Every structure is written in structure tokens, then in C-alpha cells.
Amino acid sequence: MSGSTGERSFADIITSIRYWVIHSITIPSLFIAGWLFVSTGLAYDVFGSPRPNEYFTESRQGIPLITGRFDSLEQLDEFSRSF
């Protein structure tokens, strides 16, 4: 229901031709832009996350797991040197 400010009702907006002309262009454009952002790898560069082939390198194939309770700092130093 419209108020006294002169705004259009939601049903009036979504049934107008102008709404669908604008949104039939913008919604697919946003989808394509997002797909290109991810598929080109730009999302990895922008957010700094490793690519799927960079999680495990040739020199480091194991999971960096801390096993010792009292020598955890030494294990962390060893893991950070392997990066």
C-alpha cells in the first residue's frame, strides 16, 4: 500500500516493463562478472588465498600438524621455514 509520499507499490514496480528491461540486463551481467572474477583467478589474487594447486608444494606434501605439547614452538618454526 502506498503512503502519502507518492511512492509506487512493489506490485506496480515489478509489473512494469521498464523494471524488466533494466533487470534483464543487470542481473545476467552481475552473474557473468562474478563468474569471470572467479574463473580467471583474480579472486585468488585480490583476497590472497592460495590457488588449489598451491596448497601442497613438491617439497611439502604433508599436513603441518603440531604433535608435541612441549616443543610446539620449535615445530612451528620448522613449518614456517618450509614455506
UniProtKB/Swiss-Prot annotation:
> SUPFAM superfamilies of this UniProt entry?
Cytochrome b559 subunits (SSF161045)
Please tell me where heme binds in this chain. Answer: 23
Provide one Gene Ontology biological process annotation: photosynthetic electron transport chain
A Pfam family of the record is Cytochrom_B559
User: What PROSITE patterns is this protein classified in?
Assistant: CYTOCHROME_B559
Entries under Gene3D superfamilies matching the protein = Photosystem II cytochrome b559, alpha subunit
Query: What does the record say about how the cofactor binds?
Result: With its partner (PsbF) binds heme. PSII binds additional chlorophylls, carotenoids and specific lipids.
Q: Name one GO molecular function term.
A: electron transfer activity
List the record's Gene Ontology CC terms alphabetically. Answer: chloroplast thylakoid membrane; photosystem II reaction center
Q: Which UniProt keywords apply?
A: Chloroplast, Electron transport, Heme, Iron, Membrane, Metal-binding, Photosynthesis, Photosystem II, Plastid, Thylakoid, Transmembrane, Transmembrane helix, Transport
Q: Where is the signal peptide?
A: none
InterPro entries assigned? PSII_cyt_b559_asu, PSII_cyt_b559_asu_sf, PSII_cyt_b559_CS, PSII_cyt_b559_N, PSII_cytb559_asu_lum
Q: Which co-factor is required?
A: heme b
The subcellular location is:
Plastid, Chloroplast thylakoid membrane
Its placement in the membrane is given as: Single-pass membrane protein
Asked if the keyword Kinase belongs to this entry, the reply reads no
Record text on subunit structure and interactions: Heterodimer of an alpha subunit and a beta subunit. PSII is composed of 1 copy each of membrane proteins PsbA, PsbB, PsbC, PsbD, PsbE, PsbF, PsbH, PsbI, PsbJ, PsbK, PsbL, PsbM, PsbT, PsbX, PsbY, PsbZ, Psb30/Ycf12, at least 3 peripheral proteins of the oxygen-evolving complex and a large number of cofactors. It forms dimeric complexes.
Q: Which family does it belong to?
A: Belongs to the PsbE/PsbF family.
Its name, as the record gives it, is: Cytochrome b559 subunit alpha
Q: Organism source for this protein?
A: Spinacia oleracea (Spinach)
